[in-house]
Amino acid sequence: MTKRPYEQLPLVFRHDPASGREDLLVSDRLSAAIAIIDHWPDWPSPVVIIAGPVGSGKSHLASIWRQMTGAEVIHPTAGSNAADIASAGPVLFEDVDRQGFDDTALFHVINSVRQNGTGLLMTSRLWPMSWPVTLPDLRSRLKAATVVEIGEPDDELLTQVLFKLFADRQLLVDERLVAYIVNRMERSLATAQLVVERLDHLALSRGTRLTRALAAEVLDELANARCAD
């Protein structure tokens, strides 16, 4: 078995990802969602749902919209004051399918938004018709919402995202290295985040540059982890 280079524990420095409107990477798969955000408050309906896979850019778009509107984050659970908050201004409910919600509470939020002319943005990995809704009135309200889907990233977007993620960590990388990664990685922005995070960690711990060999090791690790799941 090949012995791996000695790894030291790297110092952890904070590296906040750039998440403003000017940092948003534009591609065909994001164009509809970006248009919705940019056209606030002239939305086709007061409730908008952005649906897409993990790491597809939903959180970035939601963050931009929240900065634009001053929206409050809500979680419509039983007994919450989410509907009252929605009556006063725009509200954001992220990761709907993962966080879960109370049917009646979300129904009242949507009614409050419609009655008071505010706005509700929700993000989800699943389309709303796949949510576990049992309240017929809520299902009817969700059918009236505007749903925008974000698809899987293409090579061009993955390349842009990798360069951005490396730049967020103040790392300079060769175009050929990025092309190597793009050609071999899973088509997912979440995977791009994992690749950059792991590459940065290994390079720091071993005191080495970002190389093709290091990238190959990281990609193999991630592939093996997927096979083990």
Where are these regions (language model features)?
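Walker A/P-loop nucleotide-binding motif
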Residues: 45-61
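Post-Walker A helix-loop "phosphate-sensing" segment adjacent to the P-loop in P-loop NTPases
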Residues: 66-77
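Conserved nucleotide-sensing/catalytic segment adjacent to the nucleotide-binding pocket
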Residues: 84-124
